Each structure stands twice: as C-alpha cells, then as structure tokens.
Amino acid sequence: MSNAKLPVIIAGAGPVGMVAAADLVRQNIPVLVLEKNDALSSESRASTFHPPTLDMLDDLGFANTLIAQGLKAPTVQYSSSEDGVLGTFDFAAISDLVRHPFRLQAEQFKLTRIILDALSGNPLFSIAFGSEVKSVEQTSDTVKVVVTANGHDTTHECAWLIGADGANSIVRRSQDMEFEGFTWPERFLVMTTPVDFTALRPGVSSVSYVADPERWYFLLRILGAWRVMMPVAAETSDEEALSEAYVTASIRRIVPAELDAPILHTTLYRVHQRVAANFQKGRTFLAGDAAHINNPLGGMGMNGGIHDALNLTAKLGPVINGTADESILADYDLQRRTVTMQAIQGDTIRNKKNLEAKDEADRARFRDDIRAAAADSEKGRQLLRRIAMLDSLERAGALHVAEHHPG
C-alpha cells in the first residue's frame, strides 16, 4: 500500500467521476474529487440511461430517484423517409436480462446532483470546486497532482488518480496519452421543441431514428419537450446554422407549416470519434470522455463512461482494501478499451452511416436488417442486447490479461 496521503483522487465531477466516487465510498475508501468549475455542470449534454446502466445505478442506490426525474422510453423505433416505420423494438423483450427494461431520458446533471446530495456529509467524500488540475507526475507508488485554485497552486498526493475530466483531459495530456481518431466534417444541430410528436406521428417512439439520404434526423422525447437532431453540412458556417432562418427551415422539414414549432433551445456541436491509446498509465487511469468520445447516435458515450467507472472501481477497491493483487488492474485497459473500439466506436459509426446512406444498396440493406429484426423475435432480441450495451458489457467481462492472485 502506498504512503500517499489519499488513496484516490478523481479529476472531474461529471457523471463518470461522481459514479466512481460513489462506488469507492461504498467500499469505505476515501475519495477527493477535483472539479475545475465552481459548481456541478447544469448543462443537459447526455440524456439517455440504458437498461444495464440503470441496474448499476440501482446497485448504488440512485436509480429510483433518477427515474422519478426522467421519462421512461420503453421502445426504440427505426424509420426511413421513403418507407416509414421499419421496426419498433420493445425493451420488454430483454426483461429477463435487466431489472429496468427501458431507456430513461434524464439530463446527466440530474444524476450528478443526486450523487452529490447522497455523498455530502460523508467523511469519506470530499469535493473541491474551482480546482483545476494543472499537471500530474507519478512515481512507482505515488501520484502528485498540482491543482490551481483561486490563483494558487497546491500539490495533492494520492496512490491512484482517475482522470474523468472530459474530452480535453489534462490528466490524459499530462501523461502523453494519445487521443487517436477523427472529427466528422459535419456538425450536429440539436433543437428542443414542445411540439407533440406523439400527436403529429401516432405510434412514434420516444426514441426514433429516421434515415434520409438528404438529411437524416433523430427524435428524442424528454420531460415536457422533444429534442430533434440533424446534421449540418461542413460548408454551412456556425453562425448560419444557429440563425433563426436556418433553425426554422430545419424544424420545418419535419413539422408542417400550419403547426406552431417554437424552439426552446438550440445547440450546435462538432462530433468526434476518438479513443485514448491507453486507459491506464502506471497509477493513472482514464474514464469516460477523457478516454473516448463518439457521436451521440445510440446514447453510448455517457453510458460507456459509467461502465468504465464501475469496471475500474470494482478492481481498484479490492486492491486498495488489500483483497486483490494490483495485477487485476491491467484488465481495465484491456476490457474497456477493447469494447470501446469494437462496440461503442463501431456501433456509433455504423448508426450514423445507416441513417445517412445515399447508396441504394446500403439503404436497402439497412431497411432489410431492421425489418428482419422486427419480424423475428430472436433477431429483435439480439438488436436490443446490442443497442442496450449488454453485449459490450458481456464481451468486456470475458477479457482477461492473465491469471490473478489474491492480495
């Protein structure tokens, strides 16, 4: 065991960092969370929690409170602009595999607030807001984290550091861990509107993907509104894409002119597919967006990050508590990086290509695949296992670097 002052420091108080903190505290391990902002983020960002993620949050005691603040989506639907609905899939078909057979639509800030409320006052938990990681150095038994707060630098020492500090991770950069991948040329425009798509499109699911060779779109229902996502061509400037004229023209592609279509909020963002070359370097780990980012089609980014966090803490906790050998930590990189590359990156890229396909053969293949899954219960179940991220979790659990020995 290290002589470091703290067992674990976590950089970042987003959903990934806070889930990691909660599970370590559950294992009676003291944790310090460093958050560069002055408070928890109130941005919506990710808003989908998949069935196995809800099961994990239930094990930590947070699921019921989160579910009460969100909207259950029992089905997911795939359509095409040419052929209409291709297939609707009910998560009830995998109710024997999960305790929560639905997607939950709830903004990620709701989870971080729930966790902070639960951990506040616990002597094992501390959080420092307005504290930005400036640099990280490590030896064979200690990690030194230099933090800037109120214009002053402070050095913290710990045995283990978890970098959950987002896509621009200072932890990752300080350890010279490459962030390999690419940025899509187009951006994604998200428009939030109170338009009732259930009335406009009877039978529409709360999660609905619509393939269109000209301009695909994605409908996501949240409490009191819908989010509509569409791509924005590379040649369109950010200023134009956020203009009232452009946003209005975009929403009018799917909402008739005779209906009011007020826009409550718009967001335009660049979309990346990147994965860190390593998820572990010595005593430093990466999780969530610090380790991998992807397009949001499929809702796999935050969920994958939470899966990272709990995979890691399930290993790190026993190591710190002396019931497991440090050798088990090597499995974290193998398990989570492998499924990130094969499943999360692969599936999100495939989702985008299916929706935007212009070649008739590619579009026909997508239509045929969805229709086949809708017509065959076993194929439908396989689709649900994949999109709910059950397959990636199972795949990760089967990977091991070597035999491990008790500590």
Task: Go through each PLM region and give its residues.
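Beta1/beta-strand and adjacent pyrophosphate-binding region of the FAD-binding site
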Residues: S2-V16
